[in-house]
């Protein structure tokens, strides 16, 4: 188990147990995804929570103000506990681990689909069918991303499998093939 998981797993497992005992798992998972999105998209938030300059009470007050009406009371307690224990800077890792454990418990495969441009519903539906056959399960959580550097096509990551059907990937493979010939 990686060192970071040694720190994050106990928090994630305990919080999932609390959520299960209160029948809040689905709600908590949705909230965890929202907070992770905020953490990853707002460097001011993650920097403030990771800052050694801000005192614990200031961080807890900020968390209370930001999330008291957005999350369950048990989720707010987790946030405050992480602040008290000087672990709030690891919030993203704790929440990512929580989502991993949630998926493991429910046998949900995470598929990340990165495309060169946004996919319409028909494209998403068609791609979903193919990803389900690759993953060997209908129980999938799809994470759609857009990366214009792919130039065209898409890249699918499911577990340890990677399917690169992007133009950038084809160009890279062509370059490698030409390098072998020369």
Swiss-Prot record:
Record-level Gene Ontology MF annotations: proton-transporting ATP synthase activity, rotational mechanism
One Pfam family hit: OSCP
Highest taxon of source: Bacteria
Keywords: ATP synthesis, CF(1), Hydrogen ion transport, Ion transport, Membrane, Thylakoid, Transport
Its membrane topology: Peripheral membrane protein
Subcellular localization: Cellular thylakoid membrane
Matching Gene3D superfamilies: N-terminal domain of the delta subunit of the F1F0-ATP synthase (1.10.520.20)
A GO term from the CC aspect: plasma membrane-derived thylakoid membrane
Family to which this protein belongs: Belongs to the ATPase delta chain family.
Job description of the protein: F(1)F(0) ATP synthase produces ATP from ADP in the presence of a proton or sodium gradient. F-type ATPases consist of two structural domains, F(1) containing the extramembraneous catalytic core and F(0) containing the membrane proton channel, linked together by a central stalk and a peripheral stalk. During catalysis, ATP synthesis in the catalytic domain of F(1) is coupled via a rotary mechanism of the central stalk subunits to proton translocation. This protein is part of the stalk that links CF(0) to CF(1). It either transmits conformational changes from CF(0) to CF(1) or is implicated in proton conduction.
HAMAP family: ATP_synth_delta_bact (MF_01416)
Full protein name: ATP synthase subunit delta
Native source organism of the sequence: Prochlorococcus marinus (strain NATL2A)
């Amino acid at each position: 188990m990686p060192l970071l998981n040694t720190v994050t797993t106990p928090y994630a497992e305990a919080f999932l147990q609390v959520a299960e005992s209160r029948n809040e798992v689905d709600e908590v998972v949705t909230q965890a995804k929202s907070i992770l999105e905020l953490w990853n998209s707002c460097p001011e938030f993650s920097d403030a929570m990771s800052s050694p300059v801000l005192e614990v009470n200031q961080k807890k007050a900020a968390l209370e103000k930001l999330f008291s009406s957005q999350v369950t009371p048990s989720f707010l307690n987790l946030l405050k506990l992480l602040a008290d224990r000087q672990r709030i800077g690891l919030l993203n890792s704790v929440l990512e681990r929580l989502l991993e454990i949630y998926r493991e418990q429910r046998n949900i495969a995470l598929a990340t689909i990165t495309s060169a441009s946004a996919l319409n519903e028909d494209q998403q539906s068609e791609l979903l069918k193919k990803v389900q056959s690759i993953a060997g399960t209908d129980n999938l959580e799809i994470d759609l991303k857009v990366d214009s550097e792919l130039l065209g096509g898409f890249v699918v990551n499911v577990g340890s499998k990677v399917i690169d059907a992007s133009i950038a990937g084809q160009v890279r493979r062509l370059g490698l093939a030409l390098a072998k010939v020369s």
